[in-house]
Amino acid sequence: MPEEVHHGEEEVETFAFQAEIAQLISLIINTFYSNEEIFLQELISNASDALDKIRYESLTDPSKLDSGKELKIDIIPNPQERTLALVDTGIGMTKADLINNLRTIAKSGTKACMEALQAEKLVVITKHNDDEQYAWESSAGGSFTVHADHGEPIGRGTKVILHLKEDQTEYLEERRVKEVVKKHSQFIGYPITLYLEKEQDKEISDDEAEEEKGEKEEEDKDDEEKPKIKDVGSDEEDDSKEYGEFYKSLTSDWEDHLAVKHFSVEGQLEFRALLFSPRRAPFDLFENKKKKNNIKLYVRRVFIMDSCDELIPEYLNFIHGVVDSEDLPLNISREMLQQSKILKYVSHMKETQKSTYYITGESKEQVANSAFVERVRKQGFEVVYMTEPIDEYCVQQLKEFDGKSLVSVTKEGLELPEDEEEKKKMEESKEKFENLCKLMKEILDKKVEKVTISNRLVSSPCCIVTSTYGWTANMEQIMKAQALRDNSTMGYMMAKKHLEINPDHPIMETLRQKAEADKNDKAVKDLVVLLFETALLSSGFSLEDPQTHSNHIYHMIKLGLGTDEDEVAAEEPSDAVPDEIPPLEGDEDASRMEEVD
């Protein structure tokens, strides 16, 4: 329960931080933040978030801005009182918001609890359209106070005042504040104004008793000259000049850039990128100790890092530019990228799993129901589903991740963890089905390279796999759709298909028994061909002659229905077209005609 303290007519309520906050508050800055200047970035970022909220609300209710039309951020250092204030005209907070949000770090809209670690005392003054103006104060101890504020009205928004420690007064200097703002918050979508208090000597007449010094308050509006990240597809006439100015401000180069690439990408992650190629190669291009790239990463226009190795290959380290995203996952300090769900596979791997398994296909439903994933999923291993065409090209170059090799479950040589009993059973199956495999290879001949016992099937009788370096079924379909494909390459990349049979399936066991009884039985041959063609379809391949497969299906249906083919044989019509077409009249004369030039 809060304690109420009455000072005249003003009521002050004291609240205790939640227990975990009181214990952890002294550790947060060292644990979450690698750079102490990040506190100012956090303040500006949260001010920007508050401005976004009021702007969104004003789209449906313009009266929300009656308490202040201008959306801006002000930074006011005061060296005399050793305070740094940041004021925004955002949505503000109600009394309940102050108590609930600033009491728990996980819910903190302004992260003010963290900023307190950089200050001896923290004061938050806020005004919401639906409530009175309140003040929140804390000395980073175990409690904070909330009371109605009757001081200078702020209209709407939030004013955060940090009473800085003696060793942090550098953040009251104009140079230092500008440096931090330009580095971390250069592309915030709202104007940032820095208020400075400077002393100037003023000339006075000789008859005045003492010399006076006047103080003049000036404001330095950094936002007027700071470059903006433009939207892709803007007016091209102004692009060249603006790109040139942006490049020079980004790189401090005195020459214009050689080339520029401005693009956006939408998909699982969305981002915009603006890349520049300089006119001259940097003098340290081939030095090993230099930065691997010169790409700055922003998330929601807030600077994150300038040394993200994954953004661009090392051999393109001369490229300058910025990348801005709305949805890249960050850690709590917004200082670095956080591993996304795409990369969580390795952390879920079992101890016995030596490889990362994946399957490519046209849709999630197709690959999830594929015969190739039956055994892998039964053993409790996760399979990465890759359903984009570009994935096929990527996995051809990406051979491993985090020390784990990438293995396609649709190719030969799939190795799964086995105990001694399973190994013994597999050897027995190979010996038992050896004759059937040889017979199936003889029947299929050049259609397959070999027929083997499968260790990947559970409920399916057979499947078609490709060689380790050949194309998968999905890649084969992609290449067939290419108008400018290389037919010579397709010839040897598509040729090697392996038929794997499931020794535990009743179809294969019955087929083995029929083959041992009479390997020349026509029904055995028909069944083998039908199984092969069906396996082609279920494995994602296309049939060269669909009509032949249809005829095999119809034939099996007739056998199942007990229909005699002789009874349904169609009679030849009397006016049927003769097999041999008679020669045309005058054909002999035509053959004697000579070609005349």
Swiss-Prot record:
A motif (TPR repeat-binding) lies at residues 593-597. GO terms for biological process: cellular response to heat; protein folding; protein stabilization. Its main location: cytoplasm. Transmembrane segments: none annotated. GO terms for molecular function: ATP binding; ATP hydrolysis activity; ATP-dependent protein folding chaperone; unfolded protein binding. ATP binds at N46, D88, K107, R334. GO terms for cellular component: cytosol; extracellular exosome; perinuclear region of cytoplasm; plasma membrane; protein-containing complex. Residues 201-241, 564-597 are annotated as: Disordered. Residues 204-223, 564-578 have a biased composition (Acidic residues). It comes from the Eukaryota. Keywords: ATP-binding, Chaperone, Coiled coil, Cytoplasm, Nucleotide-binding, Stress response. It is found in: Cytoplasm. Residues 224-233 have a biased composition (Basic and acidic residues). Residues 414-446 form a coiled coil. Homodimer. Putative molecular chaperone that may promote the maturation, structural maintenance and proper regulation of specific target proteins. PANTHER family: HEAT SHOCK PROTEIN 90 FAMILY MEMBER (PTHR11528). Belongs to the heat shock protein 90 family. The TPR repeat-binding motif mediates interaction with TPR repeat-containing proteins. This is Putative heat shock protein HSP 90-beta-3. It comes from Homo sapiens. The gene is HSP90AB3P.
